[in-house]
Amino acid sequence: MRATQPRGVVAAACLMTLLAVGQPTSAVDDVTLVDAARNQESPRVRALLDQNANANVRSADGSTALLWAAHWNDIAIADSLIRAHADPNIANDFGMTPLSRACTNGSAALVELLLKAGANPNARIATGETPIMTCASSGNVDAMRLLIARGADVNANEPSQNQDALMWAASERHPNVVRMLVEAGANPRAHTKKGFTALHFAAREGDIESVRQLLAAGVDINIKSLPDKAETKQDTNPSASGGRSASGTAAAAAAPRGPGYQATISEGSTPLLVATMRGHVPLALFLLEQGADPNVIDAGLTPLHWASGTWEGGVANPVYGFSEPMSGIPNRQQKIALVTSLLAHGANPNARMTKRPPGFQGLGGGYEDAPGATPFLLACAADDVEMMRLLVTAGADPTLVTETKTTAVMAASGLNRLIGESPITEAQALAAVTFLIELGADAKGATTIGENALFGAAYRGWNTLLELLIEKGADVNAVSKANITPWLAASGYGDRLGGVLYNKEGAEILLRHGADPKLGKPCQAQVRCK
């Protein structure tokens, strides 16, 4: 749904209020009229009106009989009330009007009846939402047409996030409403306070048809979600962006792909980034064919990073327009198809992550060492040999490391990935490390905090992998800045929660290969290690 949901919240609140109408405060026959409408008693409503009951009487919360008729989409009762001079513009104490309720229900017939009775097509409810915004969300084209004909402002927005009818139509996958609004003069480039446009909302839902309508209306396929008062920070140096402009028109596929080849640096997500993050592969493929820039970077990642890695977490930052959990692209064929297409359209396999995305607990099952990581390194962290092979074939450099000097072998061995429940098996890790060694990757070396590949295997009890890494030269006596050695990690004295508490076999393997048990300082993960 939308980044904020004033419409849904208010609708629910009003329903609860309507269902809890208080005791009569005026003449019995008048308030009985509200009760009759609330209970959908049409004959009783007519009888009370025949007895000259006040058609505009309000209950304790300000609700009228007409508001209840609109709530139940009861055309007959609404017609009887209007004939008795019920005012269609009376709102209850929460600002809810009959027209707003009719739009919530998507009832063109009731919308028409209320408009003919003089309902204000631009009346706002308490949140600032207008009828056309509500109707755009419910998706009734006929109701929309009636509102537009009566002068509804197609560019009205609510004050909380500056969301408008076009955005709501796109977020609910109503391409026909999107087209109608654009034809009626809605601004397709309008954005929320967080920078999301209708195109971003359509991309977030994977709605190809709404995306088509918005692109046809002239929206830039690479439009960025720039928050209010934010300035774009974009590196326009062709060598830094791989020869691809922000509009994605240059042929970046032929650009050099070494460590210096960087993604287009900018603030703000593009529709392609949003679609890829949400796992909407058909839409992402469509956007690439339409010229979307595959190398734009936001929140530290490019589309290729999102597509290549395994994601287990959730983004709660409202700049993305959502707060639901995310799990990447579960369909394997679609995942490979998207990565293949990104590479074919010039995505840089050596692009470096600039930061860890906010709110995430996982890059490949909890991978912690994001800054500097390439798509290839993320595939290594997930022990995804098929993806690793695909990226290497496209020019990925397996020797690139993160800012903390984590190598591909370390990532594949489980280093810097949260320990605990994980779908990754030792067999997968062995296959990934073996593939890397065949590529000539070095199993030696340590990160800036002194850990090497042995730490990941020791913590997890991946002892066959442990022996392979030792055979390839990994130092069994490496000491981290926390004074932990691989032997201490295997013996249950490491500084990681959730690891194998005592990997006896691993500890013995390390001792046989020369590990010094006197090195380092035993630590319990629950206590800060010094």
Predicted regions, residues:
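N-terminal segments that cap or nucleate solenoid repeat domains
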Residues: 26-68
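Start-of-repeat signature of ankyrin repeats
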Residues: 29, 62, 95, 128, ...
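Ankyrin repeat A-helix N-terminal signature
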Residues: 35-39, 68-74, 101-107, 134-140, ...
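Terminal, low-structured helical/coil segments at or just beyond the last alpha-helical repeat
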Residues: 502-512, 516-530
